[in-house]
């Protein structure tokens, strides 16, 4: 019996389909969901949702949000999400490199606010690059 996964942003549905398994980036760590999972509501961190509709895994970059698991259905509500196959890997790599440099620079004595902004930009860039298949 498959799980139905829906990844929804305010302006579009990024994923809507049946999967055998899903892995969510919850704020307390990676969370694996199979059919028959107990009901659950969890906050999501910026990261990558991985779904397995058949033998191949698919990746979706998400920028935080919430996930609800109930009756073999996972509803993911996020402000921003991108399917990994829709992300330009080269552009994502350039964004990741720039964010990494900015984070290193901010860590060398920048203001706490700048350090936090750089860390958040790095997490977003890393999630996008991972979803595109450029980072393991």
Swiss-Prot record:
Residues 98-120 are annotated as: Disordered. It is found in: Cellular thylakoid membrane. One of its GO terms (cellular component) is plasma membrane-derived thylakoid membrane. Residues 98-116 have a biased composition (Basic and acidic residues). It comes from Crocosphaera subtropica (strain ATCC 51142 / BH68). Pfam families: ATP-synt_DE, ATP-synt_DE_N. Its main location: membrane. F-type ATPases have 2 components, CF(1) - the catalytic core - and CF(0) - the membrane proton channel. CF(1) has five subunits: alpha(3), beta(3), gamma(1), delta(1), epsilon(1). CF(0) has three main subunits: a, b and c. This is ATP synthase epsilon chain. The keyword Thylakoid applies. GO terms for molecular function: ATP binding; proton-transporting ATP synthase activity, rotational mechanism. Disulfide bonds: none annotated. InterPro entries: ATP_synth_F1_dsu/esu (IPR001469), ATP_synth_F1_dsu/esu_N (IPR020546), ATP_synth_F1_esu_C (IPR020547), ATPsynth_dsu/esu_N (IPR036771). Belongs to the ATPase epsilon chain family. Keywords: ATP synthesis, CF(1), Hydrogen ion transport, Ion transport, Membrane, Thylakoid, Transport. Produces ATP from ADP in the presence of a proton gradient across the membrane. The gene is atpC. It is a peripheral membrane protein.
């Amino acid at each position: 019996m498959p799980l139905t996964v829906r990844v929804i942003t305010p302006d579009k549905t990024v994923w809507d389909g049946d999967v055998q398994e899903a892995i969510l980036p919850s704020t307390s760590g990676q969370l694996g969901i199979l059919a028959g999972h107990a009901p659950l509501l969890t906050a999501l961190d910026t990261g990558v949702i991985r779904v397995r509709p058949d033998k191949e895994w698919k990746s979706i970059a998400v920028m935080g949000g919430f996930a609800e698991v109930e009756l073999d259905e996972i509803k993911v509500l996020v402000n921003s999400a991108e399917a990994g196959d829709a992300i330009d890997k080269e552009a994502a790599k350039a964004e990741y490199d720039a964010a990494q440099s900015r984070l290193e620079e901010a860590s060398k004595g920048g203001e706490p606010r700048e350090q936090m902004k750089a860390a958040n930009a790095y997490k977003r860039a890393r999630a996008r690059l991972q979803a595109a298949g450029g980072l393991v």
